[in-house]
Amino acid sequence: MDIFEYDGKFYSYFSYWDGLNFTKKVLDKFAVKFESELSTREKEIIRAARKSSYIITLAENGAKSTRRHEFSHAFSFTDKAYKTKVFEIVESIPKELRDKFVSGLEGMGYSIGDPAYENEEIQAYLVGYDQKEYRSFFPLILPEEVAPYVASIGEVYAKKESEVLV
């Protein structure tokens, strides 16, 4: 998808997002649904991902926080032990702070109501913590409120990253 329309305006993919993640199952559904409309480039991407279980897309010059965010989703999807550890950290967040996260996610257009999905996004935003982004995405959250969780989850992420990304 090179260009898409949102709210009456047209965007190129990476002018709107630095990164995105999805499962191979989602890609397969997309390929079947739009088979007759796929561009040559889209067909090549689908072919290249055929042996993957999880796909991450990143802008070449995207933010480091986005890279960490997207890889945290991949680690959570592909490594049960990693997911268990990061979800334990997320679930230790006090309700008042969690509500601030959920409010921010909802404000960004995330679907709210499934605690597991919310945990997944919260862990990814903790891993990809960027204070400037937080002021925009989570204006109700103060840096000192989130610091211990950023540190704890950052340790788990760094260990996994060192095992996987060389």
Predicted region positions:
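A metal-dependent hydrolase signature that marks the N-terminal structural subdomain at the beginning
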Residues: 1-53, 159, 163-166
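Short, flexible loop/turn elements at secondary-structure junctions
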Residues: 59-62, 72, 80, 131
